[in-house]
Amino acid sequence: MDALKPFLPEAKGVLPYYMIILSIISIGNSLQAYTTLHFSRRVYNGRFIRNPKLPSKTNNFEPEDQTNKLIPAQNDPKATDQLTPLAGRLFGTWTLITCIVRCYAAYNLHIGPVYTLAYWTYIVAFSHFASELFVFKTMTFGLPQYFPFALASTSLIWMPLVRDHYVQYN
């Protein structure tokens, strides 16, 4: 453990270590998003079919450009998920950017704006997962979805409670 000490955040308390651990996990998540869709498809497991109510393509209308071109159909045998290689890479990139912000914040929790930026990463993550579950229906709730919700929720509750302990400069 002494060999790791120079690399660990100096701030007192558990929050910086929590953020470092989540960042390390996020690096792995980002890498897997670039190499396989398997794990992301377990999270984004909603099933969809083409929207039969959309009109056919015309000179003025392109069904492929519509955000509602697919509709939820969890029990339809023809239904597929929406995860594509592009979506996987975008999610991997977003996760890596979030990881960088949280990792930087773990070492700089004493700076108010940095603390706030880290907090916003959890707000965005929670909002994303909640909207995918409740609005866009790209996931159903189960064990793979539990962890993103639990980690983001924990941070959203915990960080405001301990802000004054860490932040020295607003």
UniProtKB/Swiss-Prot annotation:
Gene: ERG28
Miscellaneous field: In Fusarium, the biosynthesis pathway of the sterol precursors leading to the prevalent sterol ergosterol differs from yeast. The ringsystem of lanosterol in S.cerevisiae is firstly demethylised in three enzymatic steps leading to the intermediate zymosterol and secondly a methyl group is added to zymosterol by the sterol 24-C-methyltransferase to form fecosterol. In Fusarium, lanosterol is firstly transmethylated by the sterol 24-C-methyltransferase leading to the intermediate eburicol and secondly demethylated in three steps to form fecosterol.
Presence of the UniProt keyword Calcium in the record: no
Localization: Endoplasmic reticulum membrane
GO annotation terms (biological process): sterol biosynthetic process
Taxonomy, superkingdom: Eukaryota
Function: Sterol 24-C-methyltransferase; part of the third module of ergosterol biosynthesis pathway that includes the late steps of the pathway. The third module or late pathway involves the ergosterol synthesis itself through consecutive reactions that mainly occur in the endoplasmic reticulum (ER) membrane.
InterPro entries assigned to the protein according to its UniProt record, in alphabetical order: Erg28 (IPR005352)
Transmembrane stretches, start-end: 7-27, 116-136, 141-161
Protein name in the entry: Ergosterol biosynthetic protein 28
